[in-house]
Amino acid sequence: MSTEGGLIASVAAGSFAERAGLRCGDRLLAINGHPVRDVVDVRFYGSEEELVLTVRRGAAVLSLRASRGYCEDWGGGFAEPLFDGVRSCANHCPFCFVAGLPAGLRPSLYVRDDDYRLSFLSGSFVTLTNLEESDWKRLAEQRLSPLYVSVQATEPDLRRRLLGGAPVPDIREQIRRLGELGITVHAQVVICPGFNDGAALEQTVSDLWALRSAVRSVALVPVGLTRHHPARLRRVTPGLAWEVLTMADRWRRLAYREARRRFVYPSDEIYLLAGRQVPGTATYDGFPQIANGVGLLRRFLDDWSRLRRHLMQRSGQHVTAGSVTLVSGTAMSPYVRMLAQELAQILGISVTAIEVPNCLFGPEVTVAGLLTGRDLVEALGHRELGEIVILPRTMFDAAGERTLDDWTLPELARTLGTRLATAASPSDIIHALSGADGASVPPDSA
């Protein structure tokens, strides 16, 4: 473990961090004598009211004493959430998205993490194949819950093959052990036709249902293949998607009868592949896997339903743009076209919907989250775009700043010669059209 601690990147005025004497550039080494390896340790050991912070400032090591109010926020930000580095993935899944990336994309995309701390902090999925006994002791002490686990299959030999061939622990025993520690799990199964579909998928769901005291949800996600993946892998077809939904519906009915939750949650993409409508809001049980593409479309439709009623009641809704272009990936294109037509009717402005194909990963990749800046420039560069173009928020990183191929929003605005905004919902679109400060980026932005 690194002894360098966490680099302080920001200190909020009037916060505990400022009161304790922390400064930007300090390194927090320990709290009450406990070395800190990450922000998880900071939260855990920093939960006491009386704290002694061991800090490196330049060449000096200082002890800072301060009292922290009950539930008072630290008010100090760290340069990175993990102070001792990210634990990388040692598996070799044939469908691994990162392994199939071409060169020239945003550097952070090539990090193949498999770190349970990031799973706890940000909901990233982990395989649990690299847990050591020291990790289990920490999990027992700190109760890091929930964790997000890539199961793929519960049958040990099949899971071993799906993860690349090396021996792996029995995921059923690992989940059972997590449950005994009071840690809950949100699981995902990436469906790879010919491997873990059919009877294998049925067995996986059955095994996870038997562990339902620990497993809170199971997302079913179709394998995402690009032109850079091995040819032996097959995509989920509409027919298979329908079969998966039929099986999932049966389990969802059983789970609701016995546990008052649906337990199994097919992703939006599976519904779209099968040509079926996504189910109602209540069936998502609070949207536990929305970041995994489960329920985004339902949220979109619900938001527009509410917003449409509001706009129709307020026919004088103020918008500053008379013409707008809405951009989408292929999968969401029918819904964005519907939105464009209804917005135009209600607001009395020109609204154009443009579907952007994926040139980098191939036309079979239909989600907006994998569109690149280059895709946008090639699809939009020769078109009349109106006063503002609204892009899918999922095209950009967590900070909303960069595309997969490292284009920024100001760079795209300058290249396309028009004002740009991003939106994750119909409400965001109306906000961008309102002309509010900061809602969009002009073409002459720095």
Language model features with spans:
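Short, Lys/Arg- and Gly-enriched loop/turn segments at beta-strand edges
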Residues: 34-42, 62-63
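Flexible glycine/acidic-rich beta-alpha junction loops that bind and position SAM and/or redox cofactors
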Residues: 159, 194-195, 215-240, 258-282, ...
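Short, compositionally biased
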Residues: 40-54, 69-71
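Radical SAM enzyme core and accessory elements
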Residues: 1, 7, 275-446
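Conserved Radical SAM active-site core
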Residues: 61, 68-214, 224-251
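Structural preference for beta-strand elements that scaffold enzyme active sites
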Residues: 146-148, 184-186, 217-219, 263-265, ...
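Short, structured beta-strand/loop micro-motifs enriched in basic residues and often containing a Trp
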Residues: 4-13, 33-36
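Conserved PDZ fold ligand-binding element
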Residues: 17-37
